[in-house]
Amino acid sequence: MIYTITFNPALDYVIKMQNLKIGKINKSPKEYIYPGGKGINVSIVLKVLEQETTAMGFISGFVGEEIEKQVQKYGVKTDFIKIENDNSRINIKILEETQETAINAKGPYIEEKYIELLYKKLERIEDKDSLVLSGSVPNGISNNIYETICQKLKNKNIKIVVDSTGELLLKTLKYKPYLIKPNQQELEEIFNTKIVNKDQALEYAKKLQEKGAQNVIISMGSKGAVLLDENGYSYKINALNTKDAINTVGAGDSMVAGFLAGHEMFNNYEKALQMGVAAATATTNSIFLATKEKIEENLKNFK
């Protein structure tokens, strides 16, 4: 089982239009409503790839109830903690022909008693399961939370994936997470540097591996991605077709899901990376997240 935690889920209200006129009344030709949050995205794409997954995290109010219904609609099991007397957030995404605009709400305050409930749920995770920690954390949650979770689970044989940046990520490295996936910009911020090619990215991936990470993926947008695996082997992969890209939200999450599913299927890191890139590209060519058909079509580019 692959568990994901989304600390601040949302309903994403997506509006697709040709040209947003600021300060004017705009009429939308088409709207979509989807569940949002990095962990939720990972779980949905995992399920698309026929992997068993459970989405965890915090929801609140009628918006939270709708988030859970939407997630379950994709066949994902849920084990959310319900926050009283508040509401989960609604985010607005505006997709124009040449740009995207996002308005992300703050979300509910998470009291300590709910954090303790999460820790109790995590005790039920079994050896050989996986846990994905992704994204930022909302009000009320310390930026030590990922480190604390890793510490509590360190004596179990669990694959922990961390898809975050800054201190949230760096504090987990001493617990040797199975996989981390900073993107190029996040890697540059961590090391206060500028990265221009894949070889440079691999040099800094090695530094993260030396700090404890087992496998390091660096996603590099239109340049593709690189992987430094736990055995010291490196892989470089070019981006697939990006000319049809209409949406970047969830692409990184799809890469994580594709990699985990690919390694489960093939027990091969190169093929896992290919699956990750195929899934990420499929999401960029979709209004929401990747479909199995688009992922399989993209995989043909690697044969």
What are these regions (language model features)?
Residues 1-23, 32:
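Positively charged, low-complexity intrinsically disordered leader regions
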Residues 2, 51-54, 78-79, 160, ...:
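Hydrophobic anchor at the start of a short beta-strand
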Residues 27-87:
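Substrate-binding N-lobe of the ribokinase-like
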Residues 47, 154, 264:
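Gly/Ala-rich phosphate-binding loop of Rossmann-like dinucleotide-binding domains
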Residues 83, 94-127:
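Conserved phosphate-binding/catalytic loop of the ribokinase/pfkB sugar-kinase fold
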Residues 102-104, 128-135, 163, 181-186:
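Short beta-strands and strand-loop turn motifs
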Residues 147-233:
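Conserved phosphate/ATP/ADP-binding segment of small-molecule kinases
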Residues 198-303:
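Conserved phosphate-binding/catalytic region of the ribokinase-like
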